[in-house]
Amino acid sequence: MFLIENSLIHNLINRQTGISKCLINLQKLILEFAQKKLNLRIVNYYMTPINFPYQQNPDFPNRYISPEKLFFFLQKNYSECISELGTSSLGKPIYKMTLGKGDIKVIAWSQMHGNESNATHAMLDLLAIFKGHPELYEDLFSKISLNFIFMLNPDGSEKWMRRNALDIDMNRDFLKRSSKELKLLLNLIENGNYDYALNLHEQRTIFTTDGKNPATLSFLAPSENFERDLTETRKKTMAVITKMYDRLKNILPNQIARYTDEFYPTSSGDNMTKMGIPTILFEGGHFINDYKRTGTRKFYTIALYEALKAISELNGSTENWENYQNIPQNKETHYDLIYRNVKLNTDFDCILDVAVQYREEILEGDDEISFTPIVVEVGDVSSKKGWEEIDCKGKKFISEKKFPKLDEEVNFKIE
């Protein structure tokens, strides 16, 4: 019997990430033919992201998602598998979608922070993909049962705010349970006997994997205590993340990181891990020249699928958990924009750097977020880099004020 590596077959028939359903089926036929007719044994066959048939849900092209638009879409297209979990502080519905009949029970939620929409997009994109590729759905959801909470914080999501309508950060409210929305989630979790949880978030543009490449995706196996003990629950989480990383690193090289695992005693993921539920934290981050996060959205969607796939395969195993530590850790190295060598209009010689971050907001009547440049640091910023840098040497600083003010909009020009 001859032996052939599955990766060789992938290389023969896969040359792009946007492979179609017909090519996926062709791959399966080639593999079956190799096994049955040519007496070849295929090693390590699985569906890799290389041939994942990604497509964006056409109903949600913008980064901003209106709660009302989401609710209407779910009610119109998925009424048979959604139920109202409860309502928000301002009375907006919060929907739970139930998919699959497998034995492995998974709970996931999106937009606990209202200004983090990538996870909602990822689930909406997966629904569109499953519609066109039912074989992916059937394979996955024969093994797992998923409860997905869409837009846990609809009040904050409507205003594009991190916090809820009462200005509570739900991800720091586990012990007090002051927020109505978090109580709904925790009641479901505490009575649901879940095997895994997916805590889906986004991170700022400041993070990289190596000081150069953006941390487009970061994952975390949260700690249970200040000592960061490697408990069995954490090892199960690490095993899932390791398997995800192994499958994603080739399509997103040098842009996947490991989030810091310091213990946060009031946060959701840390306490759910403490409860014995392996909880995978997702953080969608920056993608070069992509502040609308369209690229991040694509890889977030694939990562969500790969997380569910890994869970279905591991089923509580801690296999290869130790390789989690090989994933590069997030580094805080960048600003959105840095003006270098700015000479101010002062009575004395003053040359400095000005660092800028974009503030995201949804303006009344708009259906997409806007970006406002805000001064976040002034002085020597030589230890940091900018995704965009402007050298102002030999140029004029033009402003009504003599110097830029921290935490205010950029109100100057460089000419």
Predicted regions and their residues:
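Short hydrophobic targeting helices and cationic amphipathic motifs
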Residues: 3, 7, 12, 23-26, ...
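Aromatic (phenylalanine/tyrosine) cluster motif
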Residues: 2, 33, 45-46
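Short beta-strand-to-loop junctions in surface cap/lid or active-site-entrance loops
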Residues: 96-103
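C-terminal accessory segments enriched in acidic
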Residues: 41-64, 192, 220-415
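Active-site/substrate-binding loop(s) of hydrolase catalytic cores
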Residues: 103-107, 112, 117-254
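Conserved beta-strand scaffold positions in the cores of enzyme catalytic domains, especially
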Residues: 82, 96, 148, 197, ...
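Short Gly/Ser/Thr- and charged-rich N-terminal loops/segments
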Residues: 15-16, 35
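Short glycine- and acidic-rich boundary segments immediately preceding or forming the N-terminal edge
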Residues: 44-94
